[in-house]
Amino acid sequence: VSQIAGELDMTKGALYRHYKSKRDIFDCIVQRMEQQDGEQATEYDMPQEDKEKTPEKYETVSLDDFVEYSKSMFEYWTEDDFASSFRKMLTIEQFRSEEMQNLYQQYLVAGPASYVKDLFDSMKITNAKNKAVRFYAVMHFYYSLYDGAEDKENVKDEFVSAIKSLVQELK
């Protein structure tokens, strides 16, 4: 709560006057993440819903569009202060409660891997699940590498290179 208050340039007391509880603050953070995720998807004309709900949206995504979206998501999850802090918080908190583990899986592991698999299926990429796991594993690895790197631009360049290499294997 102190860190959040500091980021907002207010005291903890002022923060609690705006929100009823820590839970209320957390719910607002998750709501903001959902909103920002949707905005990212919309900006790159990517599906926001599950494939079962909007299969036609998945059919229109090209591999090149997906790669550009993936690059933007890497920047978002590493360079956007809010998203990066949320990612790091979930990484730490996933071991403290089932709810946090579920959110970690939804935002950073099973959710994205499933999304990539559905996109690859729609692109008629063979072995879509296996290739989706490999693709997303690279993204997830580079999130962690980026966090600890002194030369963050170099890590970003390495990520782009790794993604390009994977894409060549997909074609």
Predicted regions mapped to residue ranges:
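Helix-turn-helix
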Residues: 1-32
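Hydrophobic recognition helices of helix-based DNA-binding modules
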Residues: 8, 26-29, 33, 37, ...
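Hydrophobic/aromatic residues within well-ordered alpha-helical segments
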Residues: 22, 29, 33, 37, ...
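Amphipathic alpha-helical linker/stalk segments
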Residues: 27-69
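N-terminal hydrophobic signal/anchor transmembrane helix of membrane proteins
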Residues: 45-47, 162-171
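Amphipathic alpha-helical segments that line or abut small-molecule/effector binding pockets
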Residues: 56-79, 84, 88, 92, ...
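Amphipathic alpha-helical packing segments from all-alpha helical-bundle domains
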Residues: 64, 78-124
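Hydrophobic/aromatic-rich alpha-helical bundle segments in the mid-to-C-terminal region
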Residues: 102-106, 110, 119-166
